[in-house]
């Protein structure tokens, strides 16, 4: 469709047609309409712009149709040549030209831990940016629920959230935050700004329940012992809605991590003064090491002394 004539230009044309024919009385509506259409009919408009439209250079790649005749340059063998592995099929991606494969001559190095927890990473500079934008309230405790719902780590929920220390130099906002794990630099920056950080054990399912409102957040573990059963049941019965409790760690590595005060773990209160967070290794004592001598060696040394006394 040709482009429309601008209104200003059409008005000028109509005015020119009326002034050019003074013999026709202006009171006749038929004659005035005829003169208007006559003025418009003499206007010539070019529609050749439609024929000159094209894509930018490099925006369009012509489709190559192979095996459609010799004039295309890709007929018969379709650019593959005649016979051979490359014409009939393709070389395997791991083939190295016939030499001894590097994986055979040098062996496999390293491994990928299939059981490692997949953590969502959160840096301090991103946290400060979200707080300054008003997307996270620093006056309230920041839990994984607030972090996930704010969209700061994306929409996908993984096995936990790890706080990292990039941007620690400019982080000056005191916050109370709970995450799955935290680096030493992030812990130092949070506490230097007057905030508090706690690391707690989560799973992918427990994080989903937190976001959906099916669990209540707490930084205290479930008490163990028969004396606590009635109290916990009474609290659960007093609530109108049934909630899932947050899980506690069961593997040795997780228990030792959250027992460590250096990680600000929520199980660190279980340690006695001077006790190691490890479940296996104990803190060495400051006294001298007592040498244990086997009884048979003591007996053998005594008989040797008696025999030497008899000889001399």
UniProtKB/Swiss-Prot annotation:
One of its GO terms (cellular component) is mitochondrial large ribosomal subunit. Component of the mitochondrial ribosome (mitoribosome), a dedicated translation machinery responsible for the synthesis of mitochondrial genome-encoded proteins, including at least some of the essential transmembrane subunits of the mitochondrial respiratory chain. The mitoribosomes are attached to the mitochondrial inner membrane and translation products are cotranslationally integrated into the membrane. GO terms for biological process: translation. Its main location: mitochondrion. Disulfide bonds: none annotated. The keyword Ribosomal protein applies. Residues 63-89 are annotated as: Disordered. Signal peptide: none annotated. HAMAP family: Ribosomal_uL15. Component of the mitochondrial large ribosomal subunit (mt-LSU). Mature N.crassa 74S mitochondrial ribosomes consist of a small (37S) and a large (54S) subunit. The 37S small subunit contains a 16S ribosomal RNA (16S mt-rRNA) and 32 different proteins. The 54S large subunit contains a 23S rRNA (23S mt-rRNA) and 42 different proteins. Residues 70-82 have a biased composition (Gly residues). It is found in: Mitochondrion. SUPFAM superfamilies: Ribosomal proteins L15p and L18e. Belongs to the universal ribosomal protein uL15 family. It comes from the Eukaryota. GO terms for molecular function: structural constituent of ribosome. Coiled coil: none annotated. The keyword Hydrolase does not apply. Keywords: Mitochondrion, Ribonucleoprotein, Ribosomal protein. InterPro entries: Ribosomal_uL15, Ribosomal_uL15/eL18, Ribosomal_uL15/eL18_sf, Ribosomal_uL15_bac-type. It comes from Neurospora crassa (strain ATCC 24698 / 74-OR23-1A / CBS 708.71 / DSM 1257 / FGSC 987). This is Large ribosomal subunit protein uL15m.
């Amino acid at each position: 469709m040709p482009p429309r004539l601008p209104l200003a230009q059409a008005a000028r044309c109509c005015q020119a047609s009326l002034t050019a024919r003074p013999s026709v009385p202006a009171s006749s509506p038929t004659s005035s309409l005829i003169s208007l259409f006559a003025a418009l009919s003499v206007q010539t408009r070019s529609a050749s712009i439609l024929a000159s439209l094209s894509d930018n250079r490099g925006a369009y790649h012509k489709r190559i149709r192979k095996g459609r005749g010799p004039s295309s340059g890709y007929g018969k063998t379709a650019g593959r040549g005649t016979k051979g592995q490359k014409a009939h099929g393709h070389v395997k991606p791991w083939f190295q030209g016939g030499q001894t494969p590097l994986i055979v001559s040098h062996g496999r190095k390293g491994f990928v831990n299939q059981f490692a927890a997949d953590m969502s990473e959160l840096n301090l500079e991103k946290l400060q940016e979200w707080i300054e934008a008003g997307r996270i309230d620093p006056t309230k405790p920041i839990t994984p629920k607030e972090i996930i719902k704010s969209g700061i780590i994306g929409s996908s929920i993984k096995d936990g959230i790890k706080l990292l220390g990039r941007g620690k130099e400019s982080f000056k906002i005191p916050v109370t935050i709970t995450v799955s794990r935290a680096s030493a630099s992030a812990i130092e920056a949070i506490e230097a700004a007057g905030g508090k950080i706690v690391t707690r054990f989560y799973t992918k399912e427990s994080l989903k329940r937190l976001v959906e409102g099916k669990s209540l957040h707490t930084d205290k573990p479930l008490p163990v012992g028969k004396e606590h059963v009635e109290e916990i049941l009474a609290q659960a019965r007093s609530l109108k809605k049934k909630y899932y409790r947050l899980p506690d760690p069961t593997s040795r590595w997780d228990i030792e991590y959250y027992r460590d005060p250096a990680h600000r773990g929520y199980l660190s209160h279980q340690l006695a003064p001077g006790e190691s967070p490890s479940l296996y290794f104990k803190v060495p004592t400051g006294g001298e090491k007592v040498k244990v001598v086997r009884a048979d060696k003591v007996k053998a040394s005594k008989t040797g002394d008696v025999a030497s006394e008899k000889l001399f």
